[in-house]
From Swiss-Prot:
This is Phosphate import ATP-binding protein PstB. Belongs to the ABC transporter superfamily. Phosphate importer (TC 3.A.1.7) family. SMART domains: AAA. Coiled coil: none annotated. Its main location: membrane. CDD domains: ABC_PstB_phosphate_transporter. Signal peptide: none annotated. InterPro entries: AAA+_ATPase, ABC_transporter-like_ATP-bd, ABC_transporter-like_CS, P-loop_NTPase, PstB-like. The gene is pstB. It comes from Sphingopyxis alaskensis (strain DSM 13593 / LMG 18877 / RB2256). ATP binds at residues 45-52.
Length: 260
């Protein structure tokens, strides 16, 4: 794995020698990577390469799979997220997740965003919660479209609006990292453009990691790109370098469409 010319001196997250197993099958093999604050990091690679599995290991979503086992070390601000003392609920508030398919709760738009802050004690009063909900919807670029519809069901929104609602839901609990697992794959081009614009706007506030099959999207939204193949991290570098001057032959073959 090549990771030359990376200057992430104070990473938000650091993975060292990470392996992920599902039963006897190894899905991730000895992956080490740093995720920087105020950067968008894209994970690319063909289907089944392990990029989504590795993403889910960054906030212990693999814990929900009975056969999954993770070894190695993953740190958030220097703290081992797999340590027995780690509060997984708090971890997932600090490292939020936006999934491939929009999955709003069967609740009102307001309650979709307000649920997390309420259970985490971030909004002691209704007035406080109103402020948190509005701020999250503004940051997600959705406030102007829904401010007069807050009591309507989140499932009544369009697909693109639902995905932005899910992003608002994630950022309402004031995370430090946002993980996005192919957030635009189920959306039309107009909705995709809005999500990409939102990613640019959020970059200065959060460390963002996005899994995408769309190499053009990775090139547009990220500053760092990691190429995965067969469960290994083949190459990690500045996005411009990965797409214009990859150091590994497998990376070049994938970027130029020879496989994938």
């Amino acid at each position: 794995m090549t990771n030359d010319d990376l200057t992430i001196t104070d990473p938000k997250m650091r993975a060292q020698g990470v392996n992920v197993f599902y039963g006897d099958k190894q899905a991730i093999n000895n992956v080490s990577i740093d995720v920087g604050t105020d950067l968008v990091t894209a994970f690319i690679g063909p289907s089944g390469c392990g990029k989504s599995t590795f993403l889910r290991s960054l906030n212990r979503m693999n814990d929900t799979v009975a056969s999954a086992k993770v070894t190695g070390k993953i740190e958030l601000d220097g703290e081992d997220i797999y340590a027995p003392s780690m509060d997984v609920v708090q971890l997932r508030a600090r490292v939020g997740m936006v999934f491939q398919k929009p999955n709003p709760f069967p609740k009102s738009i307001y309650d979709n965003v307000g649920y997390g802050p309420r259970i985490h004690g971030l909004a002691p009063s209704k007035a406080d919660l109103d402020v948190v909900v509005e701020r999250a919807l503004v940051r997600a670029g959705l406030w102007d479209e829904v401010k007069d519809r807050l009591n309507e069901s989140g499932t009544a929104l369009s697909g693109g609006q639902q995905q932005r609602l899910c992003i608002a839901r994630a950022i309402a609990v004031d995370p430090e990292v946002i993980l996005m697992d192919e957030p635009c794959s189920a959306l039309d081009p107009i909705a995709t453009a809005k999500i990409e614009e939102l990613i640019h706007e959020l970059r200065g506030k959060y460390a963002i990691v996005i899994v995408t099959h769309n190499m053009q999207q990775a090139a547009r939204v990220s500053q760092r790109t990691a190429f995965f193949h067969l469960g290994t991290l083949v190459e990690y570098g500045k996005t411009t370098d990965i797409f214009t001057n990859p150091k590994q032959e497998r990376t070049k073959d994938y970027i130029t469409g020879r496989y994938g």
